[in-house]
Amino acid sequence: MSINSTLKREGITIINQLNTMEVNTIAANISEKLLKAFPEHNLNKSDLFISICRLNMYIADMPNDMAMAKYFYKNNSIYFSSDMNLEDLNTLAVHECLHYIQTKKNSHGKLLRLGIYNLETATNTGMALNEAAVQHMASIATNSKLDTVKYYNMELCTESPDFYPIQTALLNEMMYFTGSYPLYHSTLYSNDVFKNTFIAKSNIKTYNQIEKNFDLLFEYESKLSNEIYKLSISSEGSTNFNKIKRINSRIDDIKKIILEITLETQNTILVNCFNSELNSIRTLEDIKTFQTKLYNFKHLIISTYNYNFYNEFYSDMMNKLEEKREFILKFGNISAINSFRNELSFIEEKTFGFQFFKELLHKLKMLIEENLRAKEIEK
């Protein structure tokens, strides 16, 4: 299908193309922001600038149910909605240029991967998780601050209150366990570092479920946007109150589904990640660290009326920590074997540096010493 046919199908009508000076200004601004925001990821300002300058950028009429900007990989073009203001243009330009940077295609131009989103897998999931990652990074690059907002009867904290607020709030919860480096690296370089790191902090079933839930949230938010648009059209001088009532009912139902998926995802992150860390506790100091980490997680919690899951989980964990404390006081530190298995972090393939082998040898030494100590006790 040709680009013109694709644009027509998407409902995008070009108004005008940004000139070379306008594109160069955007490219200079974005390359500087990305370099400053993510200095540890080996980005080259000059290369970024030249690469972004190759993009075609357009102002266009966009459908109401579409995002305010869209990147098309087939013709390396970004289309900005004519309805957006200049402030949104700055953030969305970073967002769409990140999509451009993370694009991986084969020699025939077929799209293989966009950051976290791997199109070569059978499940073809991860699109929404990647969108959230890109939006999070765009917000960081434009110096957006954490803000507490309300959506669908939920109160949440995000640096992106206007674009993907729920997804970025949930992503912050995931990064609480992985740190930001794996996410940024996978988003920029299209690899599985973030995925493998999160799996190491939880399990593969948990990651897959979260990935699916992000896609579901994206799907239902699109449906919600469509229904809200229908309501705005129907409300303009309409006397068909039954139709308006039906649309409002569908809107309420979709909001409830979004709330349920969000809380289910949050609970999945909470339970599986902290249970994994609980199993890694070996010393009394580990218990203190775990307790502090569990307590501070409350600052990331997406809350709503009658949501008590975190408080109940916290209480349950405190009881389990007390059991761990009593065991350590009675028998000494817990074996390092399980901890070793959980703590070996996943790193990108073919990047086994000196530090990695140094840490590996250290952990192997710990295992050997632990086994020798166990044999001495048996004697």
What is the predicted function of each stretch?
Residues 8, 153-323, 327, 331-334:
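Pan-zinc metallopeptidase signature
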Residues 20-32, 39, 66, 123, ...:
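Low-complexity, repetitive regions of proteins mediating host interaction that are extracellular
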Residues 91-107, 135, 139:
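Active-site recognition of the HExxH zinc-binding catalytic motif
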Residues 117-163:
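Post-HExxH zinc-binding segment in Zn-dependent metallohydrolases
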